[in-house]
Amino acid sequence: KNACNSRTHLYYPKAFNYCKEYGLTYMGNTDIHGVYKQTYRTDKQSGPMTIVFAKERSQEGVKEALFAGRSVVKFGDILIGSEKNLLSLVKACLSYEVKEVKGNQALVKVTNKSTLNFEILLDNKAGTILGNATVEIKVRLDDKVKFTTTHITDDSRLVIDIASLR
């Protein structure tokens, strides 16, 4: 009843609430009992994974990051984590350049330096910032961008103020 479907694979959004409420580390895993490549077409998608924000590339670095809660789950095109970690990931992936400002309007060039796709909602208009792509977006400086494929809880998404990008 509480499961959601992402390309025919289930995930449980209520678990995100427990992570936030109890300060738990967000972890992505699978319960496959068969061949991985038969469950996830590895040429088209990957299974659930945990992105770890380690300070160093070592077993101890990964362990320290996980115990400190510095992780984000990637499941299909969905990213799940704390607001702080999702914001860190988005800031690491996307760079912004304000091209021109006229009053409260601006033209912003957004470059996605990652392979992740970001679904956004801006001024009630949906759009996608594809991986390894650059787009120009007209915005109002008092707008907020909602990243609709991010999950902090089952009903909470990452939202960034446009003004904070300047």
What do these predicted ranges mean?
Residues 1-166:
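Charged catalytic cores and adjacent phosphate/nucleic-acid-binding surfaces used
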